[in-house]
Amino acid sequence: MSVREKMLEILEGIDIRFKEPLHSYSYTKVGGEADYLVFPRNRFELARVVKFANQENIPWMVLGNASNIIVRDGGIRGFVILCDKLNNVSVDGYTIEAEAGANLIETTRIALRHSLTGFEFACGIPGSVGGAVFMNAGAYGGEIAHILQSCKVLTKDGEIETLSAKDLAFGYRHSAIQESGAVVLSVKFALAPGTHQVIKQEMDRLTHLRELKQPLEYPSCGSVFKRPVGHFAGQLISEAGLKGYRIGGVEVSEKHAGFMINVADGTAKDYEDLIQSVIEKVKEHSGITLEREVRILGESLSVAKMYAGGFTPCKR
């Protein structure tokens, strides 16, 4: 029995798409195919997929809303799991519990509707709740670490555990999940009672700032670089004269140099080449080495062509 036949038998009823292009699921609008793109409807289907992948030595990864990633042009081998159907959100007193696939911006709006404060900083951050925890997303002085109460995860071995904020060892755009290989299932956020109008005014203010300063009209991967200590990445890039600098179809935004936008059918290789070139030019100009915030996943087109027709099974 082939892997595909076994997969269809054991994972019957789960939405699996074969050789699915990932560019339509990514904010950058680039990316090759996933061998198997999976849309679990609940944590039990997710656990079944992970168990099968581990048993068959098939690599797997979970993507949130793919808002701060670049998928290479050769795509991703093995399973790519999209959890956007795990999107339930509930409110209990001053606590919001959200599944990993819940939209982060919509979750902040739910907090607003219940006059709960503490989530305003995230009102314009694209992505999923799970992805936000994974990278400790933040903006305007706030971050997920400030409001997370607990997090339920599926370990890489298929066990369900509940972790505290301390367990997650949050840092700047970092959580322990990045090393553990666990998958966020749901999150509890501890908020505080507030005044609806005051919360709305703050969210409107932050939304206006984002619209004013960021190139939201173009596909992008969000902030490309982490903030260097004592500096701002966008300012360093601008001072190096790189606003409008372009490779292929991707360019450094004129509006905010910390963003790279897809202006003309750019490719993942265009993004990678531009990122590397900007790092080198900023280093040459200021002596500061920028560190990527955006994650780059998958294989280059040349590597993918070498293994066309299959993949080499490997441990995740």
Curated annotation (Swiss-Prot):
CC annotations in GO: cytosol
Pfam families according to UniProt: FAD_binding_4, MurB_C
Gene Ontology terms: biological process: cell division; cell wall organization; peptidoglycan biosynthetic process; regulation of cell shape
Active site: R173, S223, E293
Superkingdom assignment: Bacteria
InterPro entries given in the database record: FAD-bd_PCMH (IPR016166), FAD-bd_PCMH-like_sf (IPR036318), FAD-bd_PCMH_sub1 (IPR016167), FAD-bd_PCMH_sub2 (IPR016169), MurB (IPR003170), MurB_C (IPR011601), MurB_C_sf (IPR036635), Oxid_FAD_bind_N (IPR006094)
Subcellular location: Cytoplasm
Signal peptide: none
Cofactor: FAD
PROSITE patterns: FAD_PCMH
Record-annotated disulphide pairs: none
Record's keyword terms, sorted: Cell cycle, Cell division, Cell shape, Cell wall biogenesis/degradation, Cytoplasm, FAD, Flavoprotein, NADP, Oxidoreductase, Peptidoglycan synthesis
Pathway assigned to this chain's UniProt record: Cell wall biogenesis; peptidoglycan biosynthesis
Main location: cytoplasm
NCBIfam families: murB, PRK13905.1
Function according to Swiss-Prot or TrEMBL: Cell wall formation.
Entry protein name: UDP-N-acetylenolpyruvoylglucosamine reductase
Species the sequence originates in: Streptococcus pneumoniae (strain ATCC BAA-255 / R6)
UniProt gene name: murB
